[in-house]
């Protein structure tokens, strides 16, 4: 039995690290600290040229909830076109109504657009903020998505194992349930064996110091507690050890 290990990244250095670690698919984002936003066209284009595995672009125009305005929805459609033009293989999005249900009408428009461009579709962790997950599961299957990225509605996938197990059973292989949030080499084998998921998602996040020799300590480019001279990156060994842990149970 083979497992898929999807790695979410938000910079080109992390792409190299994820591939070296054995990632089988990439979720391309910007701003992972905000949960992942749409990557730039330049990032998508270069990643497509460099990658040896499929890349799915996050389509999320802002941080926060998944209730989008008409303008934001228009941006999402344009960004799906950009992902195809950049040479990517798929897109990742999720839309909810104000009542916490899947926004079926708008999701259908995006799925049909993606499919018309030969792009695969993942419904992301907006699913974890819906009020009726099993009804939402059926809707997402009917809409034609390939997979759902979910923590089992919990703070992390290990904490959501019970719901993940139920989702796998209910899906009956009509789409993939991909476990994400808090996945690590330490817990991934148990997570897969317990729930039956065949796909996992992680960032393998780490940091490295800036290569700047001059450190401007008084100015900040963002929040006061943000260190501009610490660079977040994917840790190659974390990805490699996750892959090896899954191979040990295959």
Swiss-Prot record:
Specify the taxonomic lineage: Bacteria, Pseudomonadati, Pseudomonadota, Gammaproteobacteria, Vibrionales
Q: Which cellular component terms (GO) are annotated to the entry?
A: cytoplasm
Q: Does the keyword Cytoplasm apply?
A: yes
Q: Which UniProt keywords apply?
A: Cytoplasm
One Gene Ontology MF term: copper ion binding
Organism encoding this protein: Vibrio vulnificus (strain CMCP6)
Question: Do you know which SUPFAM superfamilies this protein is assigned to?
Answer: CutC-like
Q: Which residues cross the membrane?
A: none
Location of this chain's protein in the cell: Cytoplasm
Q: Which family does it belong to?
A: Belongs to the CutC family.
Q: What is this protein called?
A: PF03932 family protein CutC
